[in-house]
Amino acid sequence: MNVVQGNIESKNAKVAIVVSRFNSFVVDSLLNGAVDTLKRFGQVADENITVVKVPGAVELPLAARRVAACGKFDGIIALGAVIRGGTPHFDFVAGECNKGLAQVALEFDIPVSFGVLTTDTIEQAIERSGTKAGNKGGEAALGLLEMVNVLQALEEQL
């Protein structure tokens, strides 16, 4: 039986991190967690990490698509924070962001790691950006590193 799986270390990986500026007090912590994880666990060099900042979560898929289309990156991490308010706006933003990022991954055959928080409260977002519930930016980076290696292993074995 052949089992294909990836590891975390990926020294030569070129990674783009597409980041929403909206709710920056949360998203900046996600970005720090992602970059720290890429460097410490993935051994990714500074020069192989590119950060692209966009206004909000709705803009993440378009920026990710442009990054994927250039063909210079092995993977993309999308980071943002969508916090529920008193209107249905949350559902539209969160859903379209998720759907758009998944479409980019499938269209361009590139891993796109979803590090966009979708929470009911500001407190939940803060907990998930480096306090009680860990750092979801770091978790998104770990997932991306593994998928970069899984796809490389598949290419070699299939």
From Swiss-Prot:
The organism's place on the tree of life at top rank: Bacteria
Q: Give a Gene Ontology cellular component term annotated to this protein.
A: cytosol
> Is the Transport keyword given for this protein?
no
Which residues are annotated as active site?
Answer: 89 (proton donor)
Q: Which Pfam families match?
A: DMRL_synthase (PF00885)
Which catalysed reactions does the entry list for this protein? (2S)-2-hydroxy-3-oxobutyl phosphate + 5-amino-6-(D-ribitylamino)uracil = 6,7-dimethyl-8-(1-D-ribityl)lumazine + phosphate + 2 H2O + H(+)
Q: What class of enzyme is it?
A: transferase
Acyltransferase as UniProt keyword? no
One function term, GO molecular function aspect = 6,7-dimethyl-8-ribityllumazine synthase activity
> Its Enzyme Commission number?
2.5.1.78
The protein's UniProt keywords, in alphabetical order, are: Riboflavin biosynthesis, Transferase
- Give GO BP annotations, semicolon-separated: riboflavin biosynthetic process
Name the positions where (2S)-2-hydroxy-3-oxobutyl phosphate binds. Answer: 86-87, 128
What is this protein's function?
Catalyzes the formation of 6,7-dimethyl-8-ribityllumazine by condensation of 5-amino-6-(D-ribitylamino)uracil with 3,4-dihydroxy-2-butanone 4-phosphate. This is the penultimate step in the biosynthesis of riboflavin.
State what protein this is by name: 6,7-dimethyl-8-ribityllumazine synthase
At the highest ranks, the source species' classification is: Bacteria, Pseudomonadati, Pseudomonadota, Gammaproteobacteria, Alteromonadales
